[in-house]
Amino acid sequence: MEIAVVGKSEFVVGFRLAGIHKTYEVKNDKDLESKIRECLTDRNLGIIVLHSDDLKHISPGLQKVIDESVEPTFIAIGSKEDAGLRDKIKRAIGVDLWK
């Protein structure tokens, strides 16, 4: 399983420098949704990282798919810790890492 990062250039560049190969730069909300949908069909992806601010620009239908997705698991970073992250990790691997 691989990790993918989707977002604006300034967000994905750090991940690219850290060795993540599947980084996808998007220019606008339409590109963001398109790339997320493309990532959902890639069976090699286990985790997809997004910036939390980008989630505000995603359609409600795709937001629901992201929220309910176990594989790949979506991780939104860039803001305060979200209790949803804990639940997603627990669903994905079956273990509560915070205990």
Curated annotation (Swiss-Prot):
This is A-type ATP synthase subunit F. Disulfide bonds: none annotated. It is found in: Cell membrane. One of its GO terms (biological process) is proton motive force-driven plasma membrane ATP synthesis. Gene3D superfamilies: ATPase, V1 complex, subunit F. Keywords: ATP synthesis, Cell membrane, Hydrogen ion transport, Ion transport, Membrane, Transport. The keyword Ion transport applies. Component of the A-type ATP synthase that produces ATP from ADP in the presence of a proton gradient across the membrane. GO terms for cellular component: plasma membrane.
